[in-house]
Amino acid sequence: MRLCDRDIEAWLDEGRLSITPRPPVERINGATVDVRLGNKFRTFRGHTAAFIDLSGPKDEVSAALDRVMSDEIVLPDGEAFYLHPGELALAVTFESVTLPPDLVGWLDGRSSLARLGLMVHVTAHRIDPGWSGCIVLEFYNSGKLPLALRPGMLIGALSFEPLSGPAARPYNRRQDAKYRDQQGAVASRIDKD
């Protein structure tokens, strides 16, 4: 059962759940907390790679990722990031989220943005128990027009679901946690699998 707005506020008040900066009550609605777009992005460079063999040797996968992913782009205040039709880009939420070991989070994109062709997360919308950090967004523009995305705009909504008990292996305690404490638009680390 997902937390309702009253329970989300109580978990925040008690320190069991942390969202920094703490959202105002107007952004906690029904069963979700609205989150905003941060100012860090990452894109695919123009490249001539025919493919990336995701199950190939780790050093080759790592080298291929280095060739195709841009360095992190940090937008100055007031500037927009333009996502063109058919493009994929990574970004982060403005808010940093810390979940306890007995709570899982879910990120959903905004319906108003989806109706313009913007996918906010291509597949990865679960936020593991024990997670701490900004949430990476996997943007894809499936529409017909470029979309101007500005830091600070409402981009999605988080919901939270208590588990039957604390996870035995929460994300922040796993040795194989590839994205622990991420604050920026971290590129894929599939080569670390």
Curated annotation (Swiss-Prot):
Any idea which UniProt keywords this protein has?
A: Hydrolase, Nucleotide metabolism, Nucleotide-binding
Q: Where is this region: Disordered?
A: 169-193
Per the record's keyword annotation, is Aminoacyl-tRNA synthetase included, yes or no?
no
The Swiss-Prot or TrEMBL record annotates one GO molecular function as:
nucleotide binding
Q: Could you tell me the EC number(s) of this protein?
A: 3.5.4.13
The reaction(s) catalysed by this protein are: dCTP + H2O + H(+) = dUTP + NH4(+)
Task: Return the protein name.
Answer: dCTP deaminase
Source organism's superkingdom? Answer: Bacteria
- The record's active-site residues are E138
Report the record's Gene Ontology biological process terms.
dUMP biosynthetic process; dUTP biosynthetic process; nucleobase-containing small molecule interconversion
Q: Which organism is it from?
A: Salmonella typhimurium (strain LT2 / SGSC1412 / ATCC 700720)
Residues that bind dCTP, according to the entry? R110, S111, S112, L113, A114, R115, D128, V136, L137, E138, Y171, K178, Q182
Keyword Hydrolase annotated: yes
